[in-house]
C-alpha cells in the first residue's frame, strides 16, 4: 500500500522543497557530464557553467530519462552504459550536448553539503513554465476555506508528481442501494515535466474507501510559456510563473468541480454501469482488461480476486475491483493511474463494454 501524507506533512514538504529549489537555464555547450561511482551504483553528475559559477547536479532517474530522450540516446543503451561503460556514457552525453546545442532548463535541489552536487530533478525546454506546488498552496488552497465541510483526504509528493485529494461529506449519493459515493476533488501537478497541472473531480466510494479520479471533467494547464532569456539561476521574479489570470480560473474551477450539478452528472454516469452486460468469464475478462490497459500480472490477479470476492460482475463491479487494487500498490503514481482507470471503465461505450464482459 502506498504511503500518504497528512495535511500538515504535505504543507511542510511543499515548503521544504520550495526552499531547496535551484533552477538553471543555459546553453548545452556550457554543460558537461561526469559519471562516477555512487552509493547504489554509478551516477551521472551534470555540471552547468553559469555566470554565478558552476552548478552541479546529480541527475535522478527521471532526469536521466529526459536527457537520454532529448539527446536521442535509447534509454536501455543509456542505462547499460551507466552500468558497464561509464566513460563512454559521459563522452556520448558531452558529444551531443555540444554537437546539437540548445538552451535547456535544469530543475534541481541545492546541495546539502557545501561543494557537493545538488539533485537534478528534471531536464526541460527553456519554454517550460513553472506552476509550482508552492503556488498551488498559496493561490488555490485558500479557496478550500470558503467551501463548508470540505475535508482533507490524502496527499503525496513523489519524485515526479504532487497529489492532493479532499472530499465533501455533505454531498453523497447512492449508485445502488447501500453503495454510496462522496464528492471530492483532486489537484495534481508536476514540477518536472511529467504532466499538466490539473483540477479534477474525485469520487470516494464509502463502502471500502476506494478513490476514483474523473479526468473527463477536469481543467488542466500545460507548463508552456515564453522563452527564458537569462542564462543564470532564476527565481520567481525572473519568470512568468505568476499568471494571475490562470490562477483566478483555477480558483473558480475548484468551486465548479465540487458543485452539486457536476457531482450529479458523474453519479448519473456511474449509475448506468450497474446495469447492462454482466461479465461471463471473470478470468478471461481480467486477462482482456490487463492486455488493453497494461496491468501487471499481480495487478490482474488482484483485480480478479476483488471482482470475485465482491460478487458483482457488472461494469460497476469491475471498476471497483480495479480501484480496490489501486490501494494495494506500493507506488502512489501507480495508485493514481489505476484510480483513473476506474473512470475509463465507467466511460466505455456499451459495445466495448460488451466485448470485455463476454471475452
Ranges and model annotations:
Residues 130-359:
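Intrinsic disorder/low-complexity polar-acidic segments
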Residues 1-139, 147:
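Feature for intrinsically disordered/low-complexity regulatory segments and propeptides
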